[in-house]
Each structure stands twice: as structure tokens, then as C-alpha cells.
Amino acid sequence: MTTQSSSDGRMFTSSIIPVIPDSSPTAAEVIELSSQLSLPSPTSLLDFLSTSTSRGPTRSDTVGDKTQGKEVLDTRPILENSFRRENRVVTGTGGKAATGKRLKRRTESPGNACQSKIHIVSGEQIILGQSRPEKKAAKTKRTKKEDGLINYKLHGRVSKANQTVSRQPETKISAPKECNDTTQPAGNDHINDLDDGLQLEQATQRRFDWTPTKDTTIPVIDLVGDSPSSCEKSLSGMRSTRTMLSNYEFSGVVGTLGGSRSEGTPDAPTTKRPIELLKVNNFKEISGLSDDRQSSITEDSESATSKPRRVKAKNRPKSKLTTITSYATAKYTVVEKSVNLDPVETLLSDEPGKEKSAAKRTSGARCAKPGRKKSTTTEKKNEPPIFKVVHPLEAFKAFGGQELLFGTSSQLANGHSEDQHEQNEGTSHISNSSAFLPLSRSESSSKALSQASLGSGFLKLSSSKNLWSAGARDLTGAVLEIDEIDLSEHRMKPSIFAFQPKAPLGCKADTQIPPQLGEIDSDNSCQKPLAAIDPPEFVTRSETPSEKGVLHKYIVKPTHTNSCSQSGSSISVGSPEKPVQDKPIFNGFTTSELAKKVAAYGFKPIKSRDKMISLLEKCWENRNKAPNSVPKLTPGDGLSKVDEPTKGQSLGPHLQPNSISQKATTQVPKVKPAKRATKSQGVPVSSRRSTSTSKVSRKRTVSPSAILVDDDQTSDSTGDSVPPSRPRQPSKSCTPRDRENTPESFNLPTTPLTIRSGKVPSTVTSSESLPSLYTQITAAIKAQPRLRAFNGVKQPTWYEKILMYDPIQLEDLAVWLNTDGFERIGEDREVWPGLLREWCESKGVCCIWRKQRGARAHCPLVRA
């Protein structure tokens, strides 16, 4: 190998320099120079190979001067950093001057190294030549590398480490292209396979297997072909068409598909369908196969028949449960079982259309009579639990001895029983009769009746008989009596509640006066003795609290003195059978308690608390009233006249004047019976205006013995709100009317006795003439004139104070009403602070007590 160096430092080689790598010593790399132009040195060539083409570490050992050895040492770190290139030797010669030029050329013009290109030929040679125009090919290789062929570099590195340089890169370059060409269509095929697998056709086929849409269309074909199955399934279809189970109960599809699939190999979908098994069983039972035919059935059909039997055994304890769920699912469970079709038909045969159902059954099973006989034997075993669930009468009987699980089912069971309804009506009549007794007595009797007749009573609500009645009542059970009293009021006996507010008192008295009452002789003889009046039919008014437990008497005196002695003819009108009870303080009761009390008296619920209190007070007074009045009518003569008693025998030892004046304010009927009185007796009745012209005449015409009892329960006046009479009006100062104007037949007096408030007696007037104190208080406050200013300060009226939400002192308002307020409106009654507090609470007026200034009074009303 010879080298030539020119004068300018260039080196020319005219021979071939073999390059022998250590990895493959047999192979040889030949570098041919096509021309004698300036070419790079071997070291620069190795650098070029390490950076561009040969990407492996090489080790070069040159034979030459020290400068050439330094060149190798300088290029070694570049070569050793490359990947998998070891012990590569480059043999050649060079001069010192050339080495300096070569380093300079490599550093100054690195593009010259890029001008040489490695041509790979079919042989094991590497030919280096100057090919500057072929730089585009290198760019195309770079662009190919940039296109994403990252595996090209990886495969080149691996192949050059193990194989020859000349042959392996060609195969490895083509290999990744083939891999890329093969992997991409493989990936596309896989994606296409996935796309084909995600189509919804297979899913819809799976859906058609379990959805009942196909089953509903196929039974039409089997109904035409198979007559016995059509009859039986028509009955089942009529029963359960409204539920989802009806779609699974059609046996037409199973009759054909089940027989065909049982002959062949059973598939997985057929074993997973409980519908087919049930329908095969139904087809067998409906067709009426005999015992021999059933024994000849295949094992698949026997296994199919065993499954419904297991379900049948599981459903037996469910049929015994008397719950709402069992009621709702009873008919569906019966229809699902083919064995239970006959008992259902027998139950339906009791209805009017039993002949038609029987005809259908016989026509549908005309060729399967022995099979039906066997089915009836099996049905008799299962009949009692099904009969208890389905048949309502048996279920009602079973409820008596069972502990019910749900309260609602017990309500449905016993709520519509006719016997229970009659029993409730009977107890309502008994409770109505007990309503005429006093409050405590009626409550005790009603509780006893409820516990005796209805079992557990109204408070516990443990019995099923009381659940419907307890739904519309309070905890004490008083509201039920209200409803039943309203419904059965036309069947009630005449009582205090039979007094209608618009009916005349004379009409009611003709039917309600007991036969023991003595009649008055028309020939001016003495009166016959009057027996005691029955408290339930003649209600009396209570006395004031100071007269508790005292029996009072009125002395009845004949109008005209005759052969009978007046002193010996004093007769007691009536005497109560029991002492007067303590009057409860209704203001201290809660609203619920007041509602219960009102319901116990037979009235409808009232929203206003004040109205309930006033109504209860009137009812209590009418019940516990002492017989201090004379009966007003005889069975044929009408009203009897009584006279004022003398000083020695006028009143009982315990009767106080205040009680007499309090009776003067009793309530009177709403409608005047003046027409009847004038027709039967022909006596004119004094008008209201003539009796209320002056206060003096009103005060003088009070007669306690002539006060008539009012039996109306719905008058507006409140018995509790009537205050005791003023001490300046004692009963001794009262003088009776003249007796000369009355006829001798003891009919209505020509000039009736009047009470202190100026009203005519209850036989002539109505309760409208005596308004309630609440309305009178309101009228008096609004009628107050505007006051004059005092020292330049305006004095507001009571009405203006109420409008300005000023606290109203109850004592001051009571004094003003009793002195000035009632006189302006012509009212003689008096009020007290307790009544005014109730009025303020009903009207929403802020009120205070004088002693508790600045605080609202919430304490209950306590009366002395």
C-alpha cells in the first residue's frame, strides 16, 4: 500500500486499503477511489462512519508517526461512544504534514466528509466515492427516518453488531418495511373484526330469546291448532292479562317447541327457560294424559314436571298467609299451576255464569276425562289453603282465629262486614240513649258499651273491628258517635236533641210530657198532684255554684181559691233523682278535650273554642238543672199557669234570690209559637216592644215562679256567661201580673210574665230576642261616642284603644260596660273580667289584669 502526498498537504492513494473488523475477520471491506481527488484520511473516514453510516464503536491502530497515533487517540473517544462497535482496525499510511491538514480540513470544512457516500453492493465490499450530487438521497433517508420509521435505526444497529456490514443492512432495511406493512393490515383487520363483533344483530337475537314479545304472537297459531289447550288458556288469559305473568302463561309456544325440542338434543336456551317447562306440564295436564301415557313420557318431560311440583310445595305456606301480598298474588299463583285451574273454575261456577264456564271446560276437555279425574284428586289435597285465600267468606272466618300480620288487611277484611255494620248501629243507638245522661255517666256507659260490644275499646285500637271507626275519631273514641248519631238520628226516640230550633215548643211538649203529669181541672178546682219528671226527657237548668247539691222546690198554687185549701195544695213540681254535680271549668280544658265533650253531646265539630265552651256550659246546665220550673203544657190543654208564692211558702229553704234572677236570663227558643197559642186559646200575646219600653217596668215584672224552661240546645246565648243578678234587685220586690186577665181554662196568660231583661217568656219569644253577651259587648264598645280632650290630650275610646293595640284592662272595661256601656244599647246584664278575657281572646284583643300590669293574662277563669 503506497501513499502519495502533494505539495499542498493532500494525500493521494492509488491502492486499495482493506478494512478488517474484529467481529468478522473473514470479511473484508474495500475502499476504492474512483479518482485522484482530495479524499479524507482514514481517521476522518472512521469518524464519518461512526457518525453517519457505521454506528458502532471502532478502535483504530495505525502504523506511522506519533502524530498519527495522536490522531487515533483523539478520535477514540468519539468511536468508543458508539453502540456495539469493538476493535475495528484501519491500516494505512500517512505523513505528518498530511495529518495536520486532515485535522484542519475536518474542523474547518466538515461538509467535505459528507460529500463521500458509501455504496453498498451485492458483494462484501464498501466502495467510497465522491458523489456530491447524491446528497438528496441522504436527505431522503433522513426524511424517511423522520416519517416515523424509528425501528429502522434499531434494526440497523442490531444487525451490524452480529452480521456483516455489506449484506445485513439490506435485509434489515427491508424487514421493518415488511413488518410495518404486515402489522398495519393486521391491526386494521383486528379493528374490523371488533367492529363486526360490536354489531347489534347478535344482541337483538339474544333479546328475542327472553323477551315475551314473540311468545305473545305465537300462541295464536296454537290456539287454532290445539282445541283443548285453547280453551284452558283462554280462561287463564282472561284472568291474568293485566299483568306481566300473562305473557309467560300462554302454552301455545311451549306445546309445539317443547315437543320438538324434547325429541332432539336439548339446547342450553331450552333448559334455561322455566316457561317451556311449565307449559309442557300444562299441556300434559290439559290434554288429560292417563297414567300409562304419563309413565311413557321421556325423562326430560319428567324432570320438567318435577320442577313445578317443587314450586307448588313452596307456594303452599304462602297461600296460608292472610296478607295483602297474598291477596294480590293469589289468583296469579293459582293460574300458573295447571292443577289449580279446576278449583278456580269451581269457585267461578258458584257465580251466575257457572254454566258457561262448565260448558267451556267440558268442550275443551271432552277427550281427556280420565286425566281430569286424577287432577281433581290432586286438587282436593291442595284445595283448603287455596280456598282460604281466594274465597272471601272463608278468609273472613279465618281472620277470627288468626293473628293478622298487617293492619290494612284486617281493615279490608272486617270493614265491610254486614254483621259488624249492624252491630255498630246497635251500639250507636245504645250510645245515643246514654247521651241523655249526665256527662260522667254517659262517658262511663259509652266506655263500657265499647268494651263489651266492640271488644278492645276505642283507646287501644288493637282489635281489627275498631280500626275503621278509629280512623275518623280522636283517641277517646267520641267522633264515631257523632257520625252515627247524625246518620241514625231519624230512628232516635224523642229526646232533648229532637227539639229543633224552629219547631214550636207546644208541639214538642204534647209528645214529651209524661203521662204521670196531672191535668188541671177546667172547673176551677184544685190542681192534681204532679209527679216527678224523668230527667232524660225533661232537662232542667243548674243552679249557681252556691246551690250545689241542694234540692229546690217551687210551690205551685192554684189561680183561683176554691174548695181546696191553698196551703195543703202546695205540690212539688219535680225532684231530681240525684244531686246536682259540680260544674266543670271548661276554660281550663284543652281544645281537644273540648272537642271530645262536644262530640259526646252529639254535636258536630266546632272550630271556635269560645263556641265550644259556651255550648258545653249550656248543655251541662240543661242536664244538671234542678226541677225549679213548672211543666208548661199538659197533654191536651197546653200551658198551665202558676202563681207567685207567698212569703211563707214561696221558695225552699236553700233557694237564693240570685239564683232566681239568674233563671230570669234563661235561653228561649228561636221561633215564636204565637200562631199556635192564639189559635188554640184565642188569647192575644203581648209584643216585645211593649215589654221593653222602660227599665222600671221591666224590673217590676220579674216573677221567678213563672220562668219557663228552654229546651233548645243551639241558642246563641251562653248559660255560663250570665252573671248573678244585682243585689239591688231582690226577688222579694218582684210583683206578679194581674190574675184577672187569664181565662179559667188555664191557658196562656193574656199578659205574659217578663224577665228582668225585658224579654217575653220562652213560650212566646225566641232566642233571637236575647243576644249573646259577646255581641252586646262588641256593640257597646262600638257605640261609645268620641270623648272630649282633657287638658289638650285626646282621650281615645275603647274601640280606638283596641285598634291601636293598647292593652285593655279587664277590670276597667267591665266597670265601664256595667255602668255606661250597656245602658247605651239597652242591655241590663252584667259582665265580669273573666268573661271579658274570653271575649278579648276570641277577638284577638290585647288584655291585661290590673294586678298583673304589663303581662297578658293566661290563667284559666276561676269563678267564686
Swiss-Prot record:
Keyword Nucleotide-binding listed: no
Low complexity bias locations: 685-695
Subcellular location: Nucleus
GO cellular component: Slx1-Slx4 complex
Ranges of compositional bias, category Basic residues: 307-318
CDD domains xrefs: SAP_SLX4
Keyword terms: DNA damage, DNA recombination, DNA repair, Nucleus, Phosphoprotein
Main location: nucleus
Biased composition (Polar residues): 295-306, 656-668, 743-767
PTM note: Phosphorylated in response to DNA damage.
GO molecular function: 5'-flap endonuclease activity
Stretches for region Disordered: 1-21, 49-69, 91-113, 161-190, 289-318, 346-385, 413-433, 625-767
Pfam family, one: Slx4
One GO term of the biological process aspect: DNA recombination
Quaternary structure and partners: Forms a heterodimer with SLX1.
Family the entry assigns: Belongs to the SLX4 family.
Function, as annotated: Regulatory subunit of the SLX1-SLX4 structure-specific endonuclease that resolves DNA secondary structures generated during DNA repair and recombination. Has endonuclease activity towards branched DNA substrates, introducing single-strand cuts in duplex DNA close to junctions with ss-DNA.
Xref: HAMAP family: Endonuc_su_Slx4
Protein name: Structure-specific endonuclease subunit SLX4
Organism: Paracoccidioides lutzii (strain ATCC MYA-826 / Pb01)
